[in-house]
Amino acid sequence: MAKKVQAYVKLQVAAGMANPSPPVGPALGQQGVNIMEFCKAFNAKTESIEKGLPIPVVITVYSDRSFTFVTKTPPAAVLLKKAAGIKSGSGVPNKDKVGKVTSAQVREIAETKAADMTGSDVDAMMRSIEGTAHSMGLVVEG
């Protein structure tokens, strides 16, 4: 018989840097999950990813306090900031442009995010990423 799902917990945790401090500890502690077991498993799964990159994770907690988790790709905004070499987006994206990204970089980000995005093809996903770039005050060249 399948296990009964108790809760879904969605978090963003830095790759390879999960530890019992907030936000991981309180979110999983409320569900009665072994926090250190999750931290070790998450860090092992994300060791190949650049350390410190925020990784969205969906943790499924079962009624017997066991869990499974699925990692997603980093948010598009984080990948765009990294590609443009900036710390943060523009506070006024329509007026202040804070950086530039090329179409090749946008395509690379779209291909990276392909597993998590619902776009039917790479061009549709690129348009979505370009929209995110524009809302951050980035100029897409090419």
Swiss-Prot record:
<comment type="subunit">
    <text>Part of the ribosomal stalk of the 50S ribosomal subunit. Interacts with L10 and the large rRNA to form the base of the stalk. L10 forms an elongated spine to which L12 dimers bind in a sequential fashion forming a multimeric L10(L12)X complex.</text>
</comment>
<comment type="similarity">
    <text>Belongs to the universal ribosomal protein uL11 family.</text>
</comment>
<keyword id="KW-0694">RNA-binding</keyword>
<dbReference type="GO" id="GO:0006412">
    <property type="term" value="P:translation"/>
</dbReference>
<dbReference type="InterPro" id="IPR000911">
    <property type="entry name" value="Ribosomal_uL11"/>
</dbReference>
<protein>
    <recommendedName>
        <fullName>Large ribosomal subunit protein uL11</fullName>
    </recommendedName>
</protein>
<keyword id="KW-0488">Methylation</keyword>
<dbReference type="GO" id="GO:0070180">
    <property type="term" value="F:large ribosomal subunit rRNA binding"/>
</dbReference>
<dbReference type="InterPro" id="IPR036769">
    <property type="entry name" value="Ribosomal_uL11_C_sf"/>
</dbReference>
<dbReference type="InterPro" id="IPR006519">
    <property type="entry name" value="Ribosomal_uL11_bac-typ"/>
</dbReference>
<dbReference type="GO" id="GO:0022625">
    <property type="term" value="C:cytosolic large ribosomal subunit"/>
</dbReference>
<keyword id="KW-0687">Ribonucleoprotein</keyword>
<dbReference type="InterPro" id="IPR020784">
    <property type="entry name" value="Ribosomal_uL11_N"/>
</dbReference>
<dbReference type="InterPro" id="IPR036796">
    <property type="entry name" value="Ribosomal_uL11_N_sf"/>
</dbReference>
<keyword id="KW-0699">rRNA-binding</keyword>
<dbReference type="Pfam" id="PF03946">
    <property type="entry name" value="Ribosomal_L11_N"/>
</dbReference>
<dbReference type="Pfam" id="PF00298">
    <property type="entry name" value="Ribosomal_L11"/>
</dbReference>
<dbReference type="InterPro" id="IPR020783">
    <property type="entry name" value="Ribosomal_uL11_C"/>
</dbReference>
<dbReference type="InterPro" id="IPR020785">
    <property type="entry name" value="Ribosomal_uL11_CS"/>
</dbReference>
<keyword id="KW-0689">Ribosomal protein</keyword>
<dbReference type="GO" id="GO:0003735">
    <property type="term" value="F:structural constituent of ribosome"/>
</dbReference>
<comment type="function">
    <text>Forms part of the ribosomal stalk which helps the ribosome interact with GTP-bound translation factors.</text>
</comment>
